[in-house]
Amino acid sequence: MKIKFIGAAQEVTGSKHLITTDHGKKILLDCGMFQGKGLETDAANRNIMVNPEEIDYIILTHAHIDHSGLIPYFHKLGFKGEVVCTPATKDLCSIMLPDTGFIQENDMEWFNKKRRKQGLPAMQPIYTEKDARACMDLFVTVSYNRYLYLDNNIKVKFNNTGHLLGSGCAILEIDEGGKMTRIGYTGDIGREHNYLLRSPEPFPHCDYLITEATYGNRLHSDRANAEQQLLEIIYHTCVEKRGKLIIPSFAVSRTQEIVYLLNNFYSQGKLPEKIPVYVDSPLAVNATEIFRMYADLFNDDVKDMIEYNPDPFGFNSLTFVRDINQSKALNATKQPCIIISASGMMEAGRVKHHIANSIENPNNSILAIGYCAPTTLGAKLLANPKPPTVSIFGMEHSVNADIYEIDAFSGHGDYKEMINYLSCQDPSKVKKTFIVHGDPEAQQFYKRQLRKEGWDNIFIPEPGEEFELK
């Protein structure tokens, strides 16, 4: 049996890891898009290094696009197998994948206008919204902690990782000639005290382990301090300066967490009712409806709140924005307000327009609350020192607004939380551990920390590198 690391190898995005059994079955762990690589992204996503027609199963740990985003493209190229995931993951993919296809169509239309002016032929998007909807028939779901038999020799189950609604550590059990091998793939590891979701759960002992390292060299700040910092930023921006606070946020999970937190602030009287809050992202609006459907996956604090407040994602000052004209009106308003909008890395979506219209006004603030990949607008704004100007939609803008970052809202555990998550394993019995989904510096630091905890045979695969699983 072999495993080949196709994506998220010495980088964060593009998760794809191909297992080939001795019986010839091909199982792809996640099928994610590369993101945040500028002009290289499109080429990287088209160079998939595997024949989709030969893949029997895609095991999907969660719905984030850097893990799920190429499923429509693989289907377009001939993949006819099953996509196995939890029910919540399927429901989130049903809105996130078409949204990604829609964005690609719009981006390619803009790109082709430039190509036509240069006398170059038009290019096609990797896939369209229609392509994304067509692949949803391939999805097969299984609830947490229940094994699903893929065939007589292979079964899979998911243990909750607390990273995203429906996210799970995939546990594969593969029988080859009477010998059972268990492979654990963490996907993305969540926080121990998520605002909405249950904490990550232990998982069975594995012979081979594939683990992420997004924040393999970082410790998050305390969440209580982060909440106070958020309150201070809101008060300074919206009350003292009478400006706008733009919060670029991932439409799924992070937006719902921030809305839940603001709901608590308002109910506790920590924020004045007069500050309006807008969630300006159609995808976030749709995702919030799906979150409401899966209240059983919330942690005990949220469940207790629901007993007296049935909607954790609604309060008087909150408006969900779908209409594009209403979104444009937010750019024109001079009223102090909070605008939560996608995308979190500030590379696409309505938030780029809000930033372009707000960044030159010193009364305004931009607050980053999640990971921003290198080369993205978010990463450029967070650079130290702050850049004097940035390019948005091909135009230079002076960076006069205050730029803030709070990393405690991250959906990824820091290295101590990840090590604690792996404490359910006996390191001496794990034959090989593969570190993926991290920048090289984070992976190397995390590897050293694991060694201190008694882990050995740790590998950081290169893109395309293949290993025997004996």
Regions found by a protein language model. Give the residues of each.
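Core dinuclear metal-dependent hydrolase active-site scaffold
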Residues: 1-53, 134-198, 325-332, 338, ...
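Metallo-beta-lactamase
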Residues: 100-164, 295-334
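Cap/insert and terminal regions of metallo-dependent hydrolase folds
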Residues: 169, 190-279, 365-370, 389-455
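Hard-cation-handling environments
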Residues: 231-376
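Short secondary-structure boundary/capping segments
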Residues: 44, 99-103, 107-111, 225-227, ...
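Active-site neighborhood of phospho(di)ester-bond hydrolases with catalytic His/Asp-centered motifs
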Residues: 29-31, 55-64, 71, 83-86, ...
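Hydrophobic, well-ordered secondary-structure elements that form the walls
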Residues: 351, 433, 458
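Pre-active-site segment of Zn-dependent metallo-hydrolases
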Residues: 11, 21-81, 85-137, 189-199, ...
